[in-house]
């Protein structure tokens, strides 16, 4: 009996669905289907265009990045060219005068100009001088000597200067360190 009731209820539900759904052959259903197909087509087209725009944007971004990297050092190169010109003039001048003191003076001026310019423009600093306290984060001890009266390890000789760029060590200074005999 229960099974019969279920079958009747199922048939009633199917009849109600058939009443609420428009006939597939009706003109309003065909119009609605055409509208939906048109909307789907428009959305697919929009999706493909947006996808192409994104791909073009990604390619343009990659090209801009490559150009940025390629030309990032242009200003530094221009500065180096100026320093090379000055160095060339110093060499040419020394060939004419054969005066070692003049050559030394010219090269010292070029070194000062390079360091000053790079400090101002690029925040590149040179460090490592005799008398400075030894700092293992900035200095590399190549040799050590024991010395009376030294409270903290200090630099007594510099083999190679160190450089830092924006407070980041590019190269440690190679130094000789004096420390207490204790």
Swiss-Prot record:
Which GO terms label this protein's molecular function in UniProt? adenyl-nucleotide exchange factor activity; protein homodimerization activity; protein-folding chaperone binding; unfolded protein binding
| Annotated Gene Ontology cellular component terms | cytoplasm
For this protein, the record's CDD domains field holds: GrpE
Where does the protein end up? Cytoplasm
InterPro entries reported in the protein's UniProt record: GrpE, GrpE_coiled_coil, GrpE_head
Composition-biased stretches, type Basic and acidic residues, lie in 1-17
GO biological-process terms attached to the record = protein folding
The record's region (Disordered) falls at 1-33
> What Pfam family is a match for this entry?
GrpE
Q: Does the keyword field hold Chaperone?
A: yes
Keywords for this entry?
Answer: Chaperone, Cytoplasm, Stress response
Q: What does the protein in this record do?
A: Participates actively in the response to hyperosmotic and heat shock by preventing the aggregation of stress-denatured proteins, in association with DnaK and GrpE. It is the nucleotide exchange factor for DnaK and may function as a thermosensor. Unfolded proteins bind initially to DnaJ; upon interaction with the DnaJ-bound protein, DnaK hydrolyzes its bound ATP, resulting in the formation of a stable complex. GrpE releases ADP from DnaK; ATP binding to DnaK triggers the release of the substrate protein, thus completing the reaction cycle.
What family is this protein classified in?
Answer: Belongs to the GrpE family.
Assembly notes: Homodimer.
Give the NCBIfam families listed for this entry: PRK14140.1
State the name under which the record lists this protein.
Protein GrpE
Instruction: Supply the source organism for this entry.
Output: Borrelia hermsii (strain HS1 / DAH)
Q: Which gene encodes it?
A: grpE
């Amino acid at each position: 009996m229960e099974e019969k009731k279920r079958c009747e209820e199922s048939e009633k539900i199917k009849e109600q669905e058939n009443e609420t759904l428009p006939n597939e052959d009706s003109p309003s259903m065909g119009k609605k289907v055409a509208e939906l197909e048109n909307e789907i087509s428009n959305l697919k087209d929009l999706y493909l265009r947006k996808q192409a725009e994104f791909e073009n944007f990604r390619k343009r971004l990659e090209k801009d990045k490559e150009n940025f990297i390629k030309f990032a050092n242009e200003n530094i190169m221009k500065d180096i060219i100026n320093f090379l010109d000055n160095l060339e003039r110093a060499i040419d001048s020394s060939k004419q005068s054969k005066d070692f003191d003049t050559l030394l003076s010219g090269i010292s001026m070029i070194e000062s100009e390079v360091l000053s310019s790079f400090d101002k423009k690029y925040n590149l600093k040179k460090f490592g001088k005799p008398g400075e306290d030894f700092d293992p984060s900035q200095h590399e001890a190549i040799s050590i000597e024991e010395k009376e009266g030294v409270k903290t390890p200090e630099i007594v000789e510099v083999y190679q200067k160190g450089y830092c760029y924006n407070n980041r060590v590019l190269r440690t200074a190679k130094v000789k360190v004096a420390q207490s005999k204790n």
